[in-house]
Amino acid sequence: MAQREGIVLSTEKKGLMRNQKIETRNKNEASEKQRAHWGGVFAMTLCVFALIASEFMPVSLLTPMAHSLNVTEGMAGQGIAISGAFAVMTSLFISRLAGTLDRKILLLGLTSMMALSGAVIAMAPNYLIYMAGRALIGIVVGGFWSMSAATAMRLVPVHRVPLALAIFNSGNALATVVAAPLGSWLGAVIGWRGAFFCLLPVAILAFIWQLLSLPSMPVTRQPAGAGNVFTLFRRRVVTLGMLGVGIFFMGQFTLFTYIRPFLEAVTKVDASAVTLILLVIGMAGFIGTTLIGRVLKRGFYPTLMAIPVLMAIVALALIAFGSQAAIVTALLGLWGLISTAAPVGWWAWVPRTFPQNAEAGGGLMVAMVQLSIALGSTVGGMLFDHHGYRSTFLAGAAMLIIATVLIFLTSRADASAGDHS
């Protein structure tokens, strides 16, 4: 009898525990649904689109901007360099400077600064004011991207974070497709200042959407200082990898920043043809972004090494066939296909290399990429102004080959480490 009662009690206890587990699971599911702010994710994606378009708009408008501001094309290209420099500083120190400020307020402030930057650039009476406007967009780039992963983690459940980040990146991919050709077309129709003014309503819409859809994101404690980021370099795979990604993006933007002057002066195409070629680059880049994930699964480091090798070959081929429009268009289509896909691969490298510290690794990646963009556009501008396009393209190709070697060494260091920490 006692044994039977014990069995009954045990059965009741198991049933109670099962019910509690079901209730807990239901509460967790309900909590996850409550924490999913997809409207905020899409609002930030619109902000990404406007941000990328703002950052690289000068590439498609370099010639008319240089003429209007009475500077060389190389000097006009320094607008990309200064935005990269300010993005580096911001990405490293924004967490400490923002302190416990609600991250929603911080994101809204950055979006407002993006709109202000567009207005300052569009109305810039001289080169100095233009550069000040470019510095503002650099602050926004560094602040926004360094917080993107952490913000995604607060907007959606943990298992949905990769999807949220992929949606963010779709704004990036869309901007690469339409921003350059649209900027070139708008520049021909309403002038380069009008093209920058067109970014204002997009930034304002992104601000309003974020204001309505983002939840409050308070910070209860002061984030770790920027100094902790640099301790990541103690690992050989990090040092080599960051050098590889840095030289890669430096080589890319040494060449690509000055593609419009090359098309006009060497290939001898008009503004409408420039717009078409930039559209080809963007569309190819969108395709590359959608395909790169599958390719990376087949061979991660071999893919990262193949990208700069192919880009270096394209750079050399552009020198050889620069006067033939059809070949140049095909070569730049290949450039867009592989170069736009490269950031996806390198962002996949971050959680692979920093599984326990992805946010710090992401901040370091933003700083390295933006610093490289700044250096690349600066070096490219100096070479373009003083030695012509051949030296610019040769320098870009050389950097891409060096990046390939560094990526190979990174893969060896990663393999010898055996695991990621």
Q: Where are the predicted features?
A:
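Helix-breaking motifs and short loop linkers at transmembrane-helix boundaries and internal kinks
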Residues: N70, D102, M123-I129, F321-S323
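Conserved MFS/SLC helix-loop-helix module at the cytosolic interface between two early adjacent transmembrane helices
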Residues: M89-P125
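Helix-to-loop junctions at the C-terminal end of transmembrane segments
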Residues: T90-D102, G288-F300, F384-D385
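Paired small-residue
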Residues: S117, L128-L136, A326-L334
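Helix-loop-helix hairpin linking two adjacent transmembrane segments in secondary transporters
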Residues: Y127-I129, V158-H159, L163-L212
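Cytoplasmic helix-loop-helix junction between adjacent transmembrane helices
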Residues: G133-G171
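C-terminal transmembrane helical hairpin of 12-TM major facilitator-type secondary transporters
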Residues: P302-W346
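A late C-terminal transmembrane helix in Major Facilitator Superfamily
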Residues: T353-Y389, A395-G396
